[in-house]
């Protein structure tokens, strides 16, 4: 009987250890963006804990670094852009974008006031966060859209985060960069010229959403569903309680009151409770990647997304 009891104790300890590991989720953030409001609100309000989850939220300097952490298995769920799923494909790893968070285009291209149009960027230097990141793709696409060949006709420099890129623009180290709030607001105040609002040239963009390795989505489906339930509660809380979102922006992004209020107003309208995936944006991106030769293997949008979580949570309401 003692042996049986000992075995039962060992089995229980092992089961608790496995269950505990399964309930720990590392959610990698490509950057500290106002789009992360629902995540931080859900964590602060205990919504993840209510679903039996222990969440860690490391912040990376670029989408490229976030993707590398996903590939290494250090991050289970990534909060990033549609372009990062392409990086998984390029690494010959099967990954899926499975939940839309902010389906809009917040980026604008700003330049030194002496530069009057995007065509004038020939021979100039542009800052990105890192090669392979969303800022890299959008910068190169925008240049080509206006007849400027990146690398050959305009230098692309990996500088880092949006604040770092804006600092490089202000110091004269670069001539232009794409940015999002609040640096766009600061650029306007400092007299820099907006050359392009990327909303005008790119449709239905998946600015930020969740993606993961396909094997994780398959083997930990219930964990992902519980995570998304908590995230959705966070979205509802942010929408119904503006002060909760504003306080998160002040605490984690270090915004002052005025910037936090402006950031809340700009981003809250982009949050989708149903996790809608920006299929048109994926189709657009895939076509451009194929055209540029960046993607060698043939695949479709269906190879990049997993709509089953959106469909399941929609039907279970």
Give the location of each predicted region.
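Short, glycine-/small- and polar/acidic-enriched structural segments
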Residues: 23-171, 175-181, 194-198, 203-204
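Secondary-structure end/capping motifs
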Residues: 218-296
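N-terminal secretory signal peptides that target proteins for export/translocation
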Residues: 1-2
């Amino acid at each position: 009987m003692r042996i049986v009891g000992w075995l039962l104790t060992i089995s229980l300890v092992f089961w608790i250890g496995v269950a505990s590991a399964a309930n720990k989720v590392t959610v990698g953030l490509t950057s500290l963006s106002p789009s992360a409001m629902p995540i931080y609100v859900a964590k602060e309000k205990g919504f993840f804990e209510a679903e039996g989850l222990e969440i860690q939220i490391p912040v990376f300097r670029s989408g490229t670094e976030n993707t590398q952490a996903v590939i290494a298995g250090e991050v289970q769920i990534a909060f990033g852009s549609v372009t990062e799923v392409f990086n998984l494909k390029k690494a010959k790893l099967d990954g899926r974008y499975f939940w839309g968070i902010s389906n809009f285009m917040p980026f604008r291209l700003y330049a030194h006031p002496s530069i009057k149009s995007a065509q004038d960027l020939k021979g100039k230097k542009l800052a990105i966060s890192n090669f392979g990141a969303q800022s890299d793709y959008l910068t190169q696409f925008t240049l080509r859209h206006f007849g400027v060949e990146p690398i050959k006709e305009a230098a692309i420099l990996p500088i880092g985060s949006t604040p770092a890129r804006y600092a490089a623009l202000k110091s004269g180290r670069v001539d232009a960069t794409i940015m999002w709030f609040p640096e766009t607001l600061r650029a306007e105040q400092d007299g820099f010229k907006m050359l392009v609002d990327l909303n005008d040239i790119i449709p239905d963009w998946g600015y930020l959403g969740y993606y993961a390795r396909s094997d994780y989505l398959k083997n930990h489906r219930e964990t992902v569903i519980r995570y998304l339930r908590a995230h959705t509660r966070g979205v509802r809380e942010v929408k119904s309680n503006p002060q909760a979102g504003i306080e998160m922006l002040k605490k984690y992004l270090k915004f002052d009151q005025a910037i936090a209020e402006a950031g809340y107003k700009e981003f809250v309208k982009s949050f989708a409770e149903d996790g809608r995936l920006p299929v048109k944006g994926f189709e657009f991106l895939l076509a451009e990647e194929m055209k540029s030769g960046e993607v060698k293997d043939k695949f479709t949008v269906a190879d990049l997304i997993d709509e089953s979580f959106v469909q399941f949570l929609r039907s279970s309401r």
